[in-house]
């Protein structure tokens, strides 16, 4: 009890001496926990926070009846005696309120200590008000702590000199004894009442059983959204801020709690958030003199990697999934300590730009996540600056914390390194193309990065995905774009595959990443670099001096209006990520190529409902179709490039492959019907009917009429209904198509088994039914098995075969829906070139306005002033009726012309699509009626073998991609090992002795560095020179 006092911690701001309450040691349970290297943080309010009352005014906590309280009124009370009051613990049987974090606990038992001095030690702030946390006069002037509110049962006329008797520690009436009464005999206050009753006059004693008392009902709980209690409301004040070059630029301190657990506070970029109100178009950002932190002061740095994250109205879970993945990738860059480009301070060469498309559209919880990281602060943005409308709000901050998907903080203790962030909050919703214009033309021109990476919110990149993308540019200076592998998010424990839509998309993504992307990468032209995970070389995107180039063509789709907006061009820009691909490869006098990087993968959410799935594929299919047509029509541009002859020949081979694929896509509706017609119709033959009694024929006739009617219904639905409004109808058609596909698959399997077990269908050579030739075994079995077998083979070669077992059945069941539902809906909505975000939000002001004056009860309006004006208007109305004055017709608006043009083109496209498929289906079905021999059906043979040939072509290209990667890896490893042995083990000093700069590590901006001996040739250039016989794998 009388041991030496604990040492006190005196803040440095107490220049004249500490106040009396600092002598009390701080209890662990009452202080805010700020761990140094723990993964979890307790963000508790500080002691200086002001709190609103968290309980109703007529309700008193039971704990308050056991507290000593003064009977004086607060208005006339001098100093509080609580500075010498003991902390009286409660009995374990009594209810107790939780300890308030804002109240320091007193654990000292020295009750004979003199009262607190009346001199205040803390200086006031610049406004003369007490500092936060300093007891002010409104609490009675006590330096101990803010006093609680006055007791509800205190008498109003209490004497000022009334105090509570405090016994000595040796007294027989110990305050820690249960039967000690803490109330004086002459206390004028009313007697204490039961904790659960406010109507009786009985004193609350130990004998009272409060558990059996009847509780009073205080009405129902409040409805609707309630303000959170216990938090201090933001107090806004007016300040004079000097404009910088006529623009509003603010340096705002970060929140105190965030500042308290930051590992680094030595630079202003860690302690202040920079806000800029941009009032110009993104193309004029640099011209108007706007600068980013990387362009000014001590934070002036070169940017090697510029990451763009675009979002619309996604929630905090999707945002944190993407952002935490980026933070893990930046940590991996910093872990590469042997690199000349990266290393410990590699984060200084990486800038992350988050662009939100519309201030009113962004999700509030996403803003909360950004605020928790210190990037965003509410209440400082303005709509108008210096009579100029703000177009974008730019927030800059170097954050040191990250939020994972579970919204838990991760800091330096988990390997998180600082991250330079730019948050661009666009004032209006202007679609994704405009967001990319802010990224490339505004911030890109200010930073001049080497590589730009594009991500969508919701995509979770692997911890090394961004490094592998960057490495593709570092190894080959001719690479202009790189595509990563997109994987479907299968959910926890792959439970998402129980949804057939998710499973079918998982299979589709896998086959594309195993067969299609590697094939196109070998040729050097990838038809689509996915916007969810792709990268571009910033220098390759730039326009020529005349203003013509990839970016100018890319952003053309943002300004298309009226009849000048070609419907083909408008639809092509729905899949905007396909535009840059063609423009880069076909750039005049250049030799840029595109590359697929399989090791750079990321997971993304896929649509799991029918309306969302159809709407997404409508944009993709239309954009892919019209972009492919555009590339095929303009293939001559390849001859104006600087590509080698071998590369040009390979590109033309790819164009032929794309043309064949485009034809199959256009006639896919007829091919599906004919395949069903011939295969399912074979069971109508009585000789092979599996059911007998002509049941196979009846089933075929029914399914045939259902299929035809369903296709007609699909056109009607697609022309007149949205998927969101006719969800059940679209779902019903997809289920029916799956039933038809299931019966067709059953017929194929039955025919194959029948062919392999009996000779009933093969009359030409009964001794050898398995020979190759024009028979069922060759045309049906070999072609089908070869197609599916190639899928299995390539999946096993890439060591990723699980989708064949978990998702292939769902994909083949939904394959008719891909053709008949998605393709038909896409062609029937070619006129719709919007993203579903437009609306008539223009306010018309031709009628004037009623302006409020005074207190708001009266308004000011314009009305006819004289009776003559009223009579004149009436006379005009009568004269117009009598003379039948012709009313001039308003001219057709620009929007109406555009809509009419788009709908007319839609009509031509749908009519051509429908008529061509109908003619093909009718002609072939008439040439080969039902019951004809499948082995002699030339068209079915052509279809089956064409599919097998295309699959084989894709498999050969995919295999070549794998072989090239293996050869490049072996050559690169051998050359690097050789130079490390010659030049001192490959360390930095050895490379400088050889005059190679950083060419045999991560080099620099273009894959070529400025060494002294060999002009800093990168490792890929040396490898390319040694392996000239593989010239088609290099960039030349």
From Swiss-Prot:
Q: Which residues are glycosylated?
A: 38, 179
Task: Spell out the SUPFAM superfamilies in the cross-references.
Answer: Calcium ATPase, transmembrane domain M, Nucleotide-diphospho-sugar transferases
Keyword Glycosyltransferase annotated: yes
Keywords from the UniProt entry: Cell membrane, Glycoprotein, Glycosyltransferase, Membrane, Transferase, Transmembrane, Transmembrane helix
Report what the protein is called.
Answer: Chitin synthase 1
Q: What is the scientific name of the source organism?
A: Exophiala dermatitidis (strain ATCC 34100 / CBS 525.76 / NIH/UT8656) (Black yeast)
Gene of this entry: CHS1
- For region Disordered, the annotated ranges are 1-153, 189-229, 994-1019
Locations listed in the record: Cell membrane
Q: Mind giving the lineage of the organism this protein is from?
A: Eukaryota, Fungi, Dikarya, Ascomycota, Pezizomycotina
Gene Ontology MF terms: chitin synthase activity
